[in-house]
């Protein structure tokens, strides 16, 4: 279903998962400065972190895929520049994100001397 080799843009700010294809498309235009009907995947995560929507266009229509984790949360990569609202990620990074795998170790602690 999700085609590999397409550009994958991940929104860094959480979105309301009640949004449908039209409103998600508007976010793609406004926040990502991209065209929703381009050959790309646009990834959005909900405020609680357990839901994800992927918007894409297959050449004949818009597709919205909604995934909800049974346990855990989707973890997004950090912005690389101040004020950045989205990131272009690799297929491998998208695989990590959409499976709900932690990007940063949760039990890592700083040592205090």
Identify the meaning behind each predicted range.
Residues 1-113:
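Polybasic/polar functional segments that serve as interface/processing modules
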């Amino acid at each position: 279903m999700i085609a590999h080799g397409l550009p994958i843009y991940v929104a860094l700010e959480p979105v309301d998962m009640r949004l449908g294809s039209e409103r998600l498309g508007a976010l793609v235009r406004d926040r990502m400065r991209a065209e929703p009907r381009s050959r790309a995947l646009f990834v959005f995560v909900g405020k609680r972190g357990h839901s994800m929507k992927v918007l894409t266009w297959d050449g004949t229509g818009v597709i919205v895929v909604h995934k909800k984790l049974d346990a855990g949360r989707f973890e997004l990569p950090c912005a690389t520049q101040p004020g950045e609202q989205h990131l272009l990620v690799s297929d491998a990074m998208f695989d990590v994100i959409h499976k709900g795998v932690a990007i940063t170790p949760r039990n890592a602690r700083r040592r205090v001397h």
